[in-house]
Amino acid sequence: AKAFIESGMKKNVLIIGAETYSSILDYTDRGTCFIFGDGAGAAIISATSNKDEAIIDVNCSSDGNYEDLIKTAGGGSKHPCSAEVLENKMACIKMKGNETFKLAVKTLTSDVQVMMQKHNLSNEDITHFIPHQANYRIIKAVGEALGFSDEQTVVTVDIYGNTSAASIPMAMNFAYEQGRIK
């Protein structure tokens, strides 16, 4: 979205995130069935000449070295859906919770610190911290590590669960409906 707007190719970009985790949950696995939720969210990003309203920067990253932390072993192209895949619950999401927690806190904290340092921002410059809504403990630990107050941090995971790609636009909407953001 940022690239389309900055290049002048588009004035408005609609960003949508949607997930239906209920279709890949093993409801006997307490490590995942209470965490994930279904949801969809969207945001319109528009061009502006006001620097205070502009997207400052974007950071996207992934690391395949941690593929075993959260995954589905079957139901895709490597192990297509079959009676065996379904019987063995290979199409259900599996997660190594403690390892995922540690990596998420470390990575998100570091990414935010790098972005703030890059743009010479302090905690006081950040009015709202709206992270991916993975887990309340992760959000709380990252917020504390970064020095953000509870008032700065938007949390919706306790309401909707981890809706993955939908979590940030849903959290933005929640904050908007509360009058916290414009």
Enumerate the predicted regions with their spans.
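N-terminal start-of-chain detector that recognizes signal peptides
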Residues: 13-18, 100-103, 159-162
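Conserved beta-strand-centric core segments of catalytic alpha/beta enzyme folds
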Residues: 1-66, 171-182
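Claisen-condensing/thiolase-fold acyl-transfer catalytic domains that form or cleave C-C bonds
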Residues: 1-9, 105, 109, 127-182
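Conserved active-site "lid/cap" helical segment
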Residues: 75-127, 138-146, 171, 175, ...
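Short glycine-rich loop/turn motifs that provide flexible caps or phosphate-binding loops at active sites
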Residues: 16, 36-40, 75, 133, ...
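Condensing-enzyme catalytic core mediating Claisen C-C bond formation in acyl metabolism
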Residues: 29-102, 106, 110
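Generic detector of short, locally flexible boundary/turn motifs and exposed helical patches
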Residues: 6-11, 19-21, 35, 88-98, ...
